[in-house]
C-alpha cells in the first residue's frame, strides 16, 4: 500500500530486502497495479549479474550453456530468480538445493515457490544433500551460508568446474580452497577477491534504460538484454580466470546496460516514446 501511494511521483520502484516467498507476491501485485517499472533487486539484480558472469565463465572453459549441469544452493528469492533466468537463457539442467536437500516433486517441506521450481528443474529427479547433488556438476552457484562447501565436494564436480560462492561476508567456500578442489573459475560477492558478483553492475543501468525509454515495465527480455550487455563488455581476448565480470566501478557498464535495456523496451512496445 505504501509503495502504491508514493508511486505517482516516481518513475520506477526498486524493492530491496524482502524475504521469500513474500517478495514474489509483493512484486507481482505491484507490477500488475502500477504503470511504472517495479524491480526487486535481490531477485533480479543478482540473477542478471550471475548469469552474465556464467556466460563468460562457461565461454572461458570451452563449454556451452545448453550443455552444462548447474547446482544452485539456496532456494530463496535470489536462488529461485537465478534459476529462472538461467532457464530463460537456455540452460537445460539445473538443480536447486535448500537446507533440507534437493528440490524435487513430492518433497513435503517446500513452499509454493519452491514446489513450482521443482516441476521445472532437476531433470534426473535427484534427491539428497548438497554434497550428493554436486557430484559431476559443471557449476556451483551459492546464495546460502558460509563455509558449507569443501574442497573435496568441489573435487567431485566435473573437470574445469566453475564455483560462484556468494554468501557474504564469508563465502560457501574460500577461493583458495575451491581452487585446491580443482575449480577453474571462482567468483564471490566480495571486492577483495577477483570476479566480484555485485548487483551494482545491474540496477543503475537497468533503471536508466527503463527511464530513458519511459518503460511501463521491466520484462524478462529486458533483463536478458542486460545479461548480455554486461557479459559483452569483456572481449574474448580479455577473458581470463580472474576476469569474467567487469569491476563494480567500470564506468562502461551502466551506459552499456542502459542502452541495451532501452532498445529492448522500445522493440517490445513497453516504451511510451
Where are these regions (language model features)?
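A cross-family phosphate/adenosyl-ligand binding-site feature
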Residues: 22-34, 41-44, 104-125, 223, ...
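Glycine/serine-rich phosphate-binding loop and adjoining beta1-alpha1 elements at the start
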Residues: 1-68
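Glycine-rich phosphate/diphosphate-binding loop of Rossmann-like nucleotide-binding domains
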Residues: 48-145, 272
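Rossmann-like adenosine-cofactor binding region
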Residues: 115-184, 190-192
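Conserved active-site and cofactor/substrate-binding residues in soluble primary-metabolism enzymes
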Residues: 1, 21-25, 45-49, 73, ...
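General beta-strand structural signal in soluble alpha/beta enzymes
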Residues: 14-17, 38-41, 72, 96, ...
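Adenosine-phosphate binding glycine-rich loop
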Residues: 41-42, 61, 165-273
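Short, ordered loop/turn segments at secondary-structure junctions
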Residues: 17-20, 41-44, 99-102, 145-146, ...
Amino acid at each position: 500500500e505504501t509503495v502504491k501511494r508514493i508511486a505517482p511521483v516516481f518513475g520506477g520502484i526498486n524493492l530491496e530486502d524482502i524475504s521469500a516467498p513474500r517478495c514474489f507476491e509483493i512484486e507481482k501485485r505491484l507490477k500488475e497495479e502500477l504503470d511504472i517499472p517495479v524491480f526487486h533487486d535481490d531477485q533480479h539484480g543478482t540473477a542478471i549479474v550471475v548469469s552474465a558472469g556464467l556466460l563468460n565463465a562457461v565461454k572461458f572453459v570451452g563449454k556451452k550453456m545448453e550443455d552444462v549441469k548447474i547446482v544452485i544452493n539456496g532456494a530463496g528469492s535470489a536462488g529461485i530468480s537465478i534459476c529462472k533466468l538461467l532457464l530463460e537463457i537456455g540452460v537445460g539442467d539445473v538443480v536447486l538445493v535448500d537446507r533440507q536437500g534437493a528440490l524435487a516433486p513430492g518433497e513435503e517441506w517446500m513452499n509454493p515457490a519452491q514446489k513450482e521450481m521443482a516441476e521445472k528443474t532437476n531433470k534426473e529427479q535427484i534427491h539428497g544433500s548438497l554434497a550428493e547433488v554436486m557430484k559431476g556438476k559443471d557449476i556451483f552457484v551459492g546464495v546460502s551460508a558460509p563455509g558449507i562447501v569443501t574442497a573435496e565436494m568441489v573435487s567431485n564436480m566435473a573437470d574445469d568446474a566453475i564455483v560462484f560462492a556468494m554468501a557474504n561476508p564469508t563465502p560457501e567456500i574460500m577461493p583458495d580452497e575451491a581452487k585446491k578442489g580443482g575449480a577453474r573459475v571462482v567468483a564471490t560477492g566480495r571486492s577483495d577477491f577477483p570476479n566480484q558478483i555485485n548487483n551494482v553492475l545491474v540496477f543503475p543501468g537497468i533503471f536508466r534504460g527503463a527511464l530513458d525509454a519511459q518503460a511501463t515495465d521491466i520484462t524478462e527480455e529486458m533483463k536478458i538484454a542486460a545479461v548480455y550487455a554486461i557479459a559483452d563488455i569483456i572481449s574474448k581476448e580479455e577473458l581470463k580466470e580472474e576476469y569474467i565480470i567487469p569491476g563494480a566501478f567500470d564506468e562502461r557498464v551502466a551506459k552499456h546496460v542502459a542502452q541495451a535495456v532501452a532498445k529492448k523496451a522500445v522493440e517490445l512496445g513497453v516504451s511510451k516514446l
